[in-house]
Amino acid sequence: MWARNLMARALYDNVPECAEELAFRKGDILTVIEQNTGGLEGWWLCSLHGRQGIVPGNRVKLLIGPVQETPGHEQPTPGPMHQTFGQQKLYQVPNSQAASRDTIYQVPPSYQNQGIYQVPTGHGTPEQDVYQVPPSVQRNIGGTNGPLLSKKVITPVRTGHGYVYEYPSRYQKDVYDVPPSHSTQGVYDIPPSSVKGPVFSVPVGEIKPQGVYDIPPTQGVYAIPPSACRDEAGLREKEYDFPPPMKQDGKPDTRPEGVYDIPPTSTKTAGKDLHIKFPCDAPGGVEPMARRHQSFSLHHAPSQLGQSGDTQSDAYDVPRGVQFLEVPTETSEKANPEERDGVYDVPLHNPADAKGSRDVVDGINRLSFSSTGSTRSNMSTSSTSSKESSLSASPSQDKRLRLDPDTAIEKLYRLQQTLEMGVCSLMSLVTTDWRCYGYMERHINEIRTAVDKVELFLREYLHFAKGALANASCLPELVLHNKMKRELQRVEDSHQILSQTSHDLNECSWSLNILAINKPQNKCDDLDRFVMVAKTVPDDAKQLTTTISTYAETLFRADPANSHLKNGPNSIMNSSEYTHPGSQMQPLHPGDYKAQVHSKPLPPSLSKDQPPDCGSSDGSERSWMDDYDYVHLQGKEEFERQQKELLEKENIMKQSKAQLEHHQLSQFQLLEQEITKPVENDISKWKPSQSLPTTNNSVGAQDRQLLCFYYDQCETHFISLLNAIDALFSCVSSAQPPRIFVAHSKFVILSAHKLVFIGDTLTRQVAAQDIRNKVRNSSNQLCEQLKTIVMATKMAALHYPSTTALQEMVHQVTDLSRNAQLFKRSLLEMATF
């Protein structure tokens, strides 16, 4: 049965069970395309927000009867129709002859047979409102279209064992169906999105039959580049006005408008006339051209320009205070007019000073400073390759350390403790009013001494850590080397920022007039940046120290050839590799080091076939996200140890128990109990929870038993995963700070981690190759999804309270729940079908 323009309201929420089924929420208005589609009794083909799919007919209710099509000259009866759609906030497009101007919107006659007209999104710039939409509808759109149109993070709703958004499509930009192509007449007088200036009218006789918008032609309309035609004062701010293009006599300029407003290429004739030697300056970095070269502007302007001297005198509108580069005289002399891109020899873009973007650096997002394009050589860490190149082994910096494990650990802990005490000494001078003139005048010498010591102690620590990294590079397995390299990179990035800011402070001679601030300001200066980055150094150093000390037996081996090491710690204190810290720092007693080291669990002996487990470290803030890495095909004991270590890292119940509310504390305790449930692998004690039908004779009895056994395991841990996701979405919806939702995300990671481990274990035990491949692929997909979630969570914490970053984290976690459900279903299907 076919019907046109049939509308239905959703009576219940609908969770799709297949790809063809349409997801909707209670109260949604659907367009019914076909009832009992394809011979399926009770299933209707409907459309919602541009998506088509089948829906169960008993979950929707028809609003009106079918609307019969009428010829173009007939006039439909709009009365009841308008009343019904007015209640649903939809727009019924009437015939052009029967439109009521009081209650409906005027739509061109070409839409008279299109039925329900749903307003598309704007085609122009975001500032332009192409269609006038009532305020109530605009609020509805903003509240239901997700984070792109509202500032609130949209979290999906749990229905059964899955999650459904209020609107199913992610990042859905087109809320309404876009109407079909327009008729032959122009409808809207709106310029395209690239034209940001005023609309230029075109004579009526030049309108093309197929044109929809009144757009000026590309040739012969503008006397100057289009971007220079912006009359509004707001659009002219911080833009550059270039002189008009040069044309040959009788030939129009056909060069299209480019990305930058630069004069078009000159012709040979005009180029020869303009071959005048003068220093050319970078746009955006010079004084006004006419002020410096008025003689050229007034007396040497060619006739082809067709402009007066007054026009030329204000050719450039340049912001002040920016340095510039001048092209050498030889360059302009040797350059031929044919080889130039334009009238003026414009040098390459001079990178802006990095201090403007350094203002946003704080203690968490401290690495953004190293990628701001600074022109200073010692801060050129703007790419991953340059960062990694700084860690490349060189004979002078990263030479191997020939130390025995006890001596290396003793030296490492001494350097770490010295560094922590230096940072604590600096932090003790930072108070609420420490930047006021009176405080700075009394303590500026102490602050300067503390800053110098922090930089010195961090440099000494880095020297030792790079040597340990060089030792790790010689191991047969590079897993430990890669882990140490990531941890060392964070410390080295901090050292680069501290070195640069300390250098800048010394450049200004620690002037009180510069450093003393009597009133609060939004920008961060060099001293603020130094303090904020220095706060993060002890945690990063502690994480690296723990990794090195845990694997000291692997990294360090005594070298009998080095006689200066035979005498133990006393000789290493006098060796050239050790730099004595300040005498005021008192390190721990060597016995304390050994006691502290032996109190930590050491890993079993490593072999070539067993890579070191890199998940064990005490960690610093966010360290569990930075260090998260799943090692495939690991044993049950290693997996459980890794789970326990990840759970203990930044345990919020131990760190901030007094700051948590009662319901938060109980929620964390409940989740921790679920997470600690082990993954069973003893199938002899297992009893099937239900008898599963078997129709697949190709699967062996043993493989089927394994699939059913681990399916029950998946069912248990999948419920724990859903509970962890519910808790995460709840704290995101209530706008909890990063320390709360990061802690919740760890429970999500650990729960899904168990599903990956189940897949790896099953891969090793099943005999059928096709089943092994399917399980491995599903497990690998889950593992990659976990890494994506870790990165998304880290970005959400770094950019908090960015709605976009939080929404991306929510989307990734939602995808994880779907992939986990598919993984669980695949085990059941392989066992029963």
UniProtKB/Swiss-Prot annotation:
Entry keywords, A to Z: Cell adhesion, Cell cycle, Cell division, Cell junction, Cell membrane, Cell projection, Cytoplasm, Cytoskeleton, Golgi apparatus, Growth regulation, Membrane, Mitosis, Nucleus, Phosphoprotein, SH3 domain, Ubl conjugation
Transmembrane domains' residue ranges: none
A cellular component annotation (GO) from this entry: Golgi apparatus
UniProt cross-references to PROSITE patterns, sorted A to Z: SH3 (PS50002)
Induction: Induced by TGF-beta treatment in bone marrow macrophages.
Assembly, per entry: Homodimer. Forms heterodimers with BCAR1/p130cas. Forms complexes with PTK2B/RAFTK, adapter protein CRKL and LYN kinase. Part of a complex composed of NEDD9, AURKA and CTTN; within the complex NEDD9 acts as a scaffold protein and is required for complex formation. Part of a ternary complex composed of SMAD3, ITCH/AIP4 and NEDD9/HEF1; within the complex NEDD9/HEF1 interacts (via N-terminus) with ITCH/AIP4 (via WW domains); the complex mediates ubiquitination and proteasomal degradation of NEDD9/HEF1.
Role this protein plays: Scaffolding protein which plays a central coordinating role for tyrosine-kinase-based signaling related to cell adhesion. As a focal adhesion protein, plays a role in embryonic fibroblast migration. May play an important role in integrin beta-1 or B cell antigen receptor (BCR) mediated signaling in B- and T-cells. Integrin beta-1 stimulation leads to recruitment of various proteins including CRKl and SHPTP2 to the tyrosine phosphorylated form.
Protein name as it appears in the record: Enhancer of filamentation 1
Organism expressing this protein natively: Mus musculus (Mouse)
Annotated gene: Nedd9
